[in-house]
A protein has these predicted regions:
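Active-site metal-binding core of divalent-cation-utilizing nuclease and nuclease-like domains
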Residues: 1-30
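Phosphate-binding glycine-rich loops and adjacent basic patches that engage nucleotide phosphates
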Residues: 12-22, 46-51, 115-125
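Hydrophobic beta-strand positions in blades of beta-propellers and related beta-sheet-rich domains
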Residues: 19, 34, 179-182
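Intrinsically disordered, low-complexity boundary segments flanking structured domains
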Residues: 22-24, 62, 198-202
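Hydrophobic transmembrane alpha-helix bundles
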Residues: 23-38, 73-77, 101-119
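Catalytic cores of nucleic-acid endonucleases
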Residues: 30-35, 39-98
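Non-catalytic C-terminal interaction segments of nucleic acid-processing enzymes
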Residues: 91-243
């Protein structure tokens, strides 16, 4: 209860996270992350966007560090979050599972526990509610859990399905493109366009520059890499194969 896992981003910053699913990890050895999932509760909309930014600030640098494994990014949110804060996370690649405040209140009310509160709620009322929850029998809390799960079943199923797709994904296609030719630099867009108009394309022209590698998966994910030698290409492909 209350435990966190700590991961370091490529800039040397450490982040305490809620859930990380990894392959080949142990209590002593860090594995390869396949999912980062953060959880948060907010009662008021004025705090929701800040929390969304806090989540992305912790997770996106880690996603960058482990881009070869292309981990699942998840956020499980409860309470009151604005549509803008939710879309902000989704636009950055997060899968969001959101439990509306009203469904939480209704779930506890199903077991005769009133958890509704706002800024005007007296501390005495709040403490009484907390004590009621702490003393509630296991059967009552199971009832709350069941009610909340049923009320949000469609969203839960969608989130779990997306996570399962990531964990079960298979390589669908691998593209390796050897690039040749000299570099051409231009001061303006018009100069670049004139170059393209007069450029003749044929395979193997010029010196070898690098390999571009693109891998697509059955769940729609995609990873790519750019390498100057075959050894690095091989390492990249073997790493992905182990995922």
């Amino acid at each position: 209860k209350g435990k966190k896992v700590t991961w370091a981003d490529p800039y040397g910053n450490v982040h305490d996270l809620d859930y990380v699913l990894e392959r080949n990890g142990t209590n002593d050895v860090t594995g390869t992350p396949v999912a980062f999932i953060e959880m948060a509760w907010r009662r008021y909309t004025k705090h929701s966007r800040n929390k969304a930014q806090e989540i992305q600030g912790a997770i996106l640098p880690l996603a960058e560090k482990y881009q070869w494994s292309n981990p699942f990014l998840g956020a499980i949110l409860a309470g009151v979050f604005t549509d803008g804060s939710l879309e902000q996370l989704r636009s950055l690649g997060f899968h969001v599972l959101y439990f509306h405040y009203e469904t939480i209140v209704a779930a506890f009310a199903s077991e005769s526990i009133d958890v509704a509160f706002d800024e005007s709620t007296p501390d005495t009322v709040f403490r009484k509610c907390v004590q009621q929850i702490e003393k509630a029998p296991v059967s009552a809390m199971q009832g709350v859990k069941d009610h909340l799960g049923n009320a949000n079943k469609a969203n839960i199923d969608k989130f779990v399905a997306s996570l399962k797709e990531r964990l079960d994904r298979m390589v669908e296609k691998v593209i390796v493109i050897p690039l040749y030719g000299r570099s051409n630099e231009f001061a303006t867009i018009d100069d670049a366009l004139r170059f393209l108009d007069g450029h003749s394309v044929y395979e193997g022209c010029g010196d070898f520059r690098k390999y571009e590698v693109f891998i697509s998966f059955t769940n729609g994910d995609r990873v790519e890499g750019s390498f100057k030698d075959k050894t690095k290409v091989r390492e990249f492909l073997q790493f992905v194969a182990k995922q």
